[in-house]
Amino acid sequence: MKKYNRIFTIVIDSLGIGGMPDSMEYGDKGVDTLGHIAESVEKFNIPNLEKLGISNLHPIKHVKAAEKPLAHYMKMKEASVGKDTMTGHWEMMGLHITKPFQTFTDTGFPQELLDELTKRTGHNIVGNKSASGTEILDELGEHQMKTGDMIVYTSADSVLQICGHEETFGLDELYRCCEIARELTLKDEWKVGRVIARPYLGSKKGEFKRTSNRHDYALKPYGSTALNTLKDNGFDVISVGKISDIFDGEGITESNKSKSSVHGMEQTLEIMDKDFKGLCFVNLVDFDALWGHRRNPVGYAEEIEKFDIKLGKVLEKLKEDDLLIITADHGNDPTYVGSDHTREFVPFIAYSPSMKENGLMDTVDSFATIGATIADNFELKMPENTIGKSVLEKLV
């Protein structure tokens, strides 16, 4: 018998809680996204995360351990190889990624790929290096507006990103070019996890801003996930933010794009008013995109505080047969060197108004605990060749 009719899983993108045992192998010595954020500010007001037990799970400055935490909580290790968005989310829903997605961080993309992209799109290409979005626009935004050239760049992730000015290049044209790039990068030697359309507005260097019309063209998951199992058995799988893009729409019954993390939480609150049975799967990307990669711990702290305010409203709306799970997909310590993700434990914080118990659970060896627990709740078997063990029976 189902314990919960609705499960809300919220991914605070990149909110790691300390380096994993193998983090040194990824160049991530001493990382701690949440801990170092708290140490970087004079005050850190997150009363709702506090009462759920965030500082009981991972003691941090300015935030007290709750005497009677409301939630069950534990740390999750990443079983897969990698520390990127797709690996983290795919593992949550049961996939074990044993071969990391290919990156072009140090080399840029092969000339043969760029030549083919130019031939197919009709646009010359500039950039072709690893850079932050703000840097590449400051450097090449004006040039692109004048010439119609495509800005192509990458990052520490397995991504090919294309920038286009919404007014001079055009959104439809940008999407067309990205679809061609996605087709080309399905070849093994050029394969990337995602092609990302990065539209922007503004008229000169220093004023360019990326817009919310971003679109991700992801690889399809390598196998069936918990999302497919839910959908195939008639349950709702409602996505918020970039979840649908990450899974290339696989297993999703309703997709809601977000303009910001605050907007994503507002969408979640609206979905809570709906009568559905199944999963609402939320990704809040601003933590990672605006603050983690840009190494801004103060901005990151403020974003968490904004989230906490909305979280309070979510807690008020939860029904007795609702379950809330708060987690993350990787770390991105904004005090660490470089601009890359960091290999960290992530939180598993589970709460329902019907829970009679609470407290610390043993660390688990995979993010896939989430997908397995969700499937178990709806009395479904996880697909073949997936990983993860349910902790549903402990959520009492």
Curated annotation (Swiss-Prot):
Gene Ontology cellular component terms for the protein in this record: cytosol
Compartments reported by the entry: Cytoplasm
Enzyme Commission number(s) from the entry: 5.4.2.7
Family annotation (InterPro entries): Alkaline_phosphatase_core_sf, DeoB, Metalloenzyme, Phosphopentomutase_DeoB_cap_sf
Cited CDD domains: PPM
Pathway(s) of this molecule: Carbohydrate degradation; 2-deoxy-D-ribose 1-phosphate degradation; D-glyceraldehyde 3-phosphate and acetaldehyde from 2-deoxy-alpha-D-ribose 1-phosphate: step 1/2
Recorded superkingdom: Bacteria
The protein's required cofactors: Mn(2+)
Binding site for Mn(2+) 1: D13, D329, H330
Binding site for Mn(2+) 2: D288, H293, H341
Listed name of the protein: Phosphopentomutase
